[in-house]
Amino acid sequence: MTTTSAFMLNVRLDNVAVVAIDVPGEKVNTLKAEFATQVRAILKQIRENKALQGVVFISAKADNFIAGADINMIGHCQNAQEAETLARQGQQLMAEIQALPVPVIAAIHGACLGGGLEMALACHRRICTDDVKTVLGLPEVQLGLLPGSGGTQRLPRLVGVSTALDMILTGKQLRARQALKAGLVDDVVPQTILLEAAVELAKKERLAQRTLPVRERILAGPLGRALLFRLVRKKTAQKTQGNYPATERIIDVIETGLAQGSSSGYDAEARAFGELAMTPQSQALRAIFFASTEVKKDPGSDAPPGPLNSVGILGGGLMGGGIAWVTACKGGLPVRIKDINTQGINHALKYSWDLLETKVRRRHIKASERDKQLALISGSTDYRGFSHRDLVIEAVFEDLPLKQQMVAEVEQNCAAHTIFASNTSSLPIGDIAANAARPEQVIGLHFFSPVEKMPLVEVIPHASTSAQTIATTVKLAKKQGKTPIVVSDKAGFYVNRILAPYINEAIRMLTEGERVEHIDAALVKFGFPVGPIQLLDEVGIDTGTKIIPVLEAAYGERFSAPANVVASILNDDRKGRKNGRGFYLYGEKGRKSKKQVDPAIYKLIGVQGQSRLSAQQVAERCVMLMLNEAARCFDEKVIRSARDGDIGAVFGIGFPPFLGGPFRYMDALGPGEMVATLQRLAALYGPRYAPCEQLVRMAERREHFWTNGETDQGN
């Protein structure tokens, strides 16, 4: 059996070798271990051809250079030594590219990430296109790793240590102009002339190393370096709370290379890569990566999707404006907005204008592209322009009769095949569809706020929703750049259902006297991006608590909020950040004054505000209720799999990614430990902590939510 090479060498008449990268049968180029032999064969030919003037590496794919190394390679490593060997092999290959006797140019169009950028860094010069798809970065930290093929050593020497630390510690991706400004690439050109521009660069004599800016040169010296690394360590520890060991190792490895030389740096990089690959944090983060990749490929149902050429939106408020933006500007679909007045339409249009104008100002897109995307959005105060819409999303108030009226109006004014998707966060989809003439075309599509930032959507079919409606709605969500999970039509759906007891318990501890900042800090230390009380302020106390009575009516007392507390807060006109006062006080809009806890909140709820519980106890009380409810959702088939439950929690509410999601975390703790902990908490705090039947059964049978074959890598 003949294997087609992913690297093809062509020597032009002008004696420039062009190496085209095209992984067979894949949409995206990724580096695999078996490619080393192919690359070395090409490098041997290049070294032996004394007439060559230069070499250009370029992708034959339409929209990516190299998107990174194949992460499955790490999953195949049985121990740290094997992972370290993998890194050393990558380092050696990059060193051989760098050692070529003629100028070597990386011609970059599309994603150049991870191992792809490390390969480009091994080239002597880099040139990239000005296309919006072109991004360069080292995102390994997001998988609990560090760049293992020389990236931690070459990048600081090319762009300076502070820029390199920022890129590697955050996984930040630079667009073309940003990369040029940083010194990461030497030129930016239109895609049409990329190859010729790279060839011309390859014909030139090797240029001297780029001179770093004065600031970077100062920071590269012993005194500047010592100060920089001290500050970076402090800032990173505050941000990660010690939950991400990769960040500490990245700092150590870069410092080693600068202080002791490249050889020591490469050695430290390989050892750190091997050790990090075996950490539970990296295994969990890689599992989330594979799970999200699988979800993005999941069509939602076995039926083929229906037509999806244009979309209507009912309501031009915050959610409607955000949905219009992701539909038109991410999905490329024409959008028609209907609102009861022109102010609503103008608000939605301004929402998109502001987001696009920010992109223009940051030079991410051109003004012409902004205008082209805005032209996809139009509006009216009636149903003109709706007759041919394939799908209509309602984003109106949480009022059942109003939403039922919207269904009737859409059925009357739109095509027979038009799907009605409700953005409700709490109302049953079956109730919204109760009077529909075509209930099979009614579905829930729950976005999270702010729509342009939150990656998750819940797709909620009711009992009569057709398979094609599900498939079409999932297809739309993907076009909008979202990660969709299909969940059952039960009160709270999935994300809000597991979030509610978590927030309720935080408020309950507040009534027991725990301080606001202590509760929030405890959950941030556990790994959440913000604490539960701050989250409620950010969402809006009125909005965030509206679902509590719905859940209490459906599931009983375990969802009841502490008596009268929420009412007292709302009656005092405290809505959170949106009106400047909630549990916290906020400075004037536009000012950088920090939020601070409002001392009056304690008097309002009748407590002194003196913390007694440890951070671990606070986190345990909140998180265990969330986990217990997630297990119930699994048992009741609210979610289709543990995979969907983990993705929903991580992408929807910021469950700590380094734990892999609630189900992977419960598997790590073990069902027996889960049950024992919940029983202990139930004895202390009441029956709301009683372990659910699913966990008790699993403890008896020693079962897990994830099977062994699903845990570490893509299937």
From Swiss-Prot:
UniProt key word Cytoplasm: yes
Keyword Protein biosynthesis: no
A Pfam family of this chain: 3HCDH_N
Compartment(s) where it occurs, according to its Swiss-Prot or TrEMBL record: Cytoplasm
A Gene Ontology BP annotation from the UniProt entry: fatty acid beta-oxidation
InterPro entries recorded: 3-OHacyl-CoA_DH_CS, 3-OHacyl-CoA_DH_NAD-bd, 3HC_DH_C, 6-PGluconate_DH-like_C_sf, ClpP/crotonase-like_dom_sf, Enoyl-CoA_hydra/iso, FA_oxidation_alpha_subunit, FadJ
Keywords, in A-Z order: Cytoplasm, Fatty acid metabolism, Isomerase, Lipid degradation, Lipid metabolism, Lyase, Multifunctional enzyme, NAD, Oxidoreductase
Superkingdom assignment: Bacteria
Residues flagged as site, Important for catalytic activity: 118, 140
GO molecular function, one term: 3-hydroxybutyryl-CoA epimerase activity
One Gene Ontology term, aspect cellular component: cytoplasm
Protein role: Catalyzes the formation of a hydroxyacyl-CoA by addition of water on enoyl-CoA. Also exhibits 3-hydroxyacyl-CoA epimerase and 3-hydroxyacyl-CoA dehydrogenase activities.
Protein name: Fatty acid oxidation complex subunit alpha
